[in-house]
Amino acid sequence: NAAALGTDSSPNGNTFTVNNLTSIDQSTDYPEVNFCTWNPLRFWNRSGTLQKVSFDNGNLRAIFDDNGYNEYAFASIGVDTGKWFCEMKAEDVTATANTRIGVLNMDYTGTGNPGDQSTSVSYMANGQKRVGGSNSSYGASYTNGDIIGVALDVTNNTVTFYKNGASQGAISITAN
């Protein structure tokens, strides 16, 4: 609608003043259902072998074959500066599962679990953190349906995990 150029149709009420624009400058904006998608190219199990995993929902969900190994998938695009944040929904977490959400640096070899090497850290479903192969007290436990946030601050070498929006505390990480 060229007559409504600059009018926000979302519930946010961000209407803008239009200067030197005409209907030819107008394009439709579809802000709903925008998600960044994960580019998963590496998936491993604890033995360091390639793992059968499938992805659905625009690569927003990883489905593992549940062969008895600890299984994980890595994003393929690393970062080396700045501050980054993502959130994920915990699914299929059980009392006996070794569910972890973590951050790995470029030197991670793909063997062992996230947090087993000094080049990685993880937030475990039981509320512990794992850094350099050692578990220690960290935050609240999480289970199915919880939203886990990960704030990576490469500039200050910290990662902070969030459970349903509540910070669990900053963890120092090895830069690389």
Predicted features, each with a name:
Residues 1-176:
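PRY/SPRY (B30.2) beta-sandwich protein-interaction domains
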